């Protein structure tokens, strides 16, 4: 039977999606299922790994049924996932020994403090391109091994497996036959040396994580194994692509050349710039990470992670009940006319790149009796654009590359006001692609290249098309005045303490 589609599994922080893409890179079907969030203590975020798997199985079944697709028409499966989230499971039973500790969770912050006090920061930075932070997987694995009775000894005996979510999905989809990850996910663990391309003995010793529990690291585009027949109505489908969500979006946006960058506006905001075969060491608070590895060649990226972006709009809607739908924020922001001197620093969980301050909290400045709800909403929406400029300034400083355009994706960029304001504040064109689902598309492309569904990156690059291009049209004096106000607000926020 003719292969007509590639299936992408997009396993995110709050939901799992299965999406079909045709040869033109267009969406041919989608199914989505949310799953529960677990908050055992303030600042802790966990997921039930079995519930994640159930959500994935359900979306695959719904997608095939709704689209009336024969599994034999699927060329391969690409997997993209919430990065850094860590799972440890029993190899014999396949059962997790603890919940998945989510990337957002701060429950390992004390471990991070101890590692910093022991003087490990520079070594971690040099080997991994990362900072010592609770964000990354390594301290999460250590926490599980520290807190589950007998876990570390069982791991040393080879009885336990660790994986980021991609590894967990593949283990289950292949019936426990395949324990792998790819370069992109490995590079987010704080245990993987991005220069030697191997699990690093010194890092593992620092965290007291046994090497026996780690997955094999493979390229981002190859056939890793076949699914069990029960998931695809008696058929086996090759799993052929893996990338962490932000790297998948970089690939889906066809950012194949050094100096091309994308920004994903989701719960948080993640800007990545392709730096080619050069691992650029940041001096400005950014992360150095692996963009992807294909056909024996690894390419790198600079990354700036903003912790709160689209979630600020959700907070206005659900927490403050300022409007009914997230999309209403555009009308409120436009009605305001300007921000009336109001600045909103959404440091709900601290500030990410380039500041990396987890000890501060959100703040609002410039309120007067004349401040309206519209001004407040506008200031919140504008905060996404200001934070992006913070990251872009750092990125251009590190790379020595002046950005010519920014490719944007994610839910918040559907807001035309936000997209235009972003272009104005950056003084750079912002390009919104026709296919908004760039994360899933990137995973599909990686799988399709491995199975021959697509022939080359050149073929993929030709499919990338612009829905709308936003050109900067704000006078320079006004742009710099607004940004200077933001910088003052951030400085004041960082100086404020509640004892």
From Swiss-Prot:
Disulphide-bonded residues: none
Annotated residues for binding of sn-glycerol 3-phosphate: 13, 83-84, 135, 245
Pfam families (UniProt xref): FGGY_C, FGGY_N
Alphabetical GO biological process terms: glycerol catabolic process; glycerol metabolic process; glycerol-3-phosphate metabolic process
Entry GO CC: cytosol
Binding site for ATP: 13-15, 267, 310, 314, 411
Swiss-Prot/TrEMBL catalytic activity: glycerol + ATP = sn-glycerol 3-phosphate + ADP + H(+)
Pathway: Polyol metabolism; glycerol degradation via glycerol kinase pathway; sn-glycerol 3-phosphate from glycerol: step 1/1
Activity control: Inhibited by fructose 1,6-bisphosphate (FBP).
Annotated ADP binding sites: 13, 17, 267, 310, 411, 415
Binding positions for glycerol per the UniProt entry: 83-84, 135, 245-246
GO molecular-function terms, A-Z: ATP binding; glycerol kinase activity
Sorted UniProt keywords: ATP-binding, Glycerol metabolism, Kinase, Nucleotide-binding, Transferase
EC number of this enzyme: 2.7.1.30
Function comment: Key enzyme in the regulation of glycerol uptake and metabolism. Catalyzes the phosphorylation of glycerol to yield sn-glycerol 3-phosphate.
Family under the similarity heading: Belongs to the FGGY kinase family.
Name of the protein: Glycerol kinase
Provenance organism: Xanthomonas campestris pv. campestris (strain 8004)
């Amino acid at each position: 039977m003719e292969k007509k589609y590639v299936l992408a599994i997009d396993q995110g922080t709050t939901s799992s999606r299965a999406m079909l893409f045709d040869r033109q890179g267009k969406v041919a079907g989608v199914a989505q299922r949310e799953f529960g969030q677990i908050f055992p203590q303030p600042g802790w975020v966990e997921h039930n790994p079995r519930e994640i798997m159930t959500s994935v199985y359900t979306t695959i079944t719904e997608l095939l049924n709704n689209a009336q697709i024969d599994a034999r028409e699927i060329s391969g499966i690409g997997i993209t996932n919430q990065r850094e989230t860590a799972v440890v499971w029993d190899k014999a039973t396949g059962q997790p020994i603890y919940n998945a500790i989510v990337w957002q969770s701060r429950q390992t912050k004390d471990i991070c403090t101890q590692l910093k006090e022991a003087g490990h920061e520079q070594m971690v930075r040099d080997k991994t391109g990362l900072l010592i932070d609770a964000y990354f997987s390594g301290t999460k694995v250590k926490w599980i091994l520290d807190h589950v009775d007998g876990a570390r000894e069982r791991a040393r005996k080879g009885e336990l497996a660790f994986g980021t979510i991609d590894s967990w999905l593949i283990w289950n989809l292949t019936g426990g036959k395949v324990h792998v990850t790819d370069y992109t996910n490995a590079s987010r663990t704080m245990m993987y040396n991005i220069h030697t391309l191997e699990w690093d003995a010194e890092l593992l010793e620092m965290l007291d994580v046994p090497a026996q529990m780690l997955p094999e690291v493979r390229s981002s585009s190859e056939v890793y194994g076949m699914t069990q027949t029960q998931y695809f109505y008696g058929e086996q489908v090759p799993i052929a692509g893996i990338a962490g969500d932000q790297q998948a979006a970089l690939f889906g946006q066809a950012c194949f050349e050094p100096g091309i960058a994308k920004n994903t506006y989701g719960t948080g905001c993640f800007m990545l710039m392709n730096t080619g075969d050069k691992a650029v060491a940041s001096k400005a608070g950014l992360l150095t990470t692996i963009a992807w590895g294909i056909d024996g060649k690894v390419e790198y990226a600079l990354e700036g992670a903003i912790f709160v972006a689209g979630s600020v709009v959700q907070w206005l809607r659900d927490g403050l009940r300022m409007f009914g739908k997230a999309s209403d924020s555009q009308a409120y922001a436009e009605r305001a006319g300007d921000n009336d001197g109001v600045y909103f620093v959404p440091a709900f969980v601290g500030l990410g790149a380039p500041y990396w301050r987890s000890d501060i909290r959100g703040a609002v400045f410039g309120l007067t009796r004349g401040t309206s709800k519209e001004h407040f909403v506008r200031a919140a929406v504008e905060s996404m654009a200001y934070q992006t400029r913070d990251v872009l300034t750092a990125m251009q400083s590190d790379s020595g590359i002046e950005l010519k355009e920014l490719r944007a994706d994610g839910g918040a960029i559907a807001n035309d006001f936000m997209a235009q304001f972003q272009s104005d504040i950056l003084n750079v064109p912002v390009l919104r692609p026709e296919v908004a689902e760039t994360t899933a598309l990137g995973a599909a492309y990686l799988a399709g290249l491995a199975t021959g569904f697509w022939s080359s990156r050149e073929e993929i690059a030709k499919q990338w098309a612009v829905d709308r291009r936003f050109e900067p049209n704000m006078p320079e004096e006004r742009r710099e005045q607004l940004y200077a106000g933001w910088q003052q607000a951030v400085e004041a926020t960082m100086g404020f303490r509640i004892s």
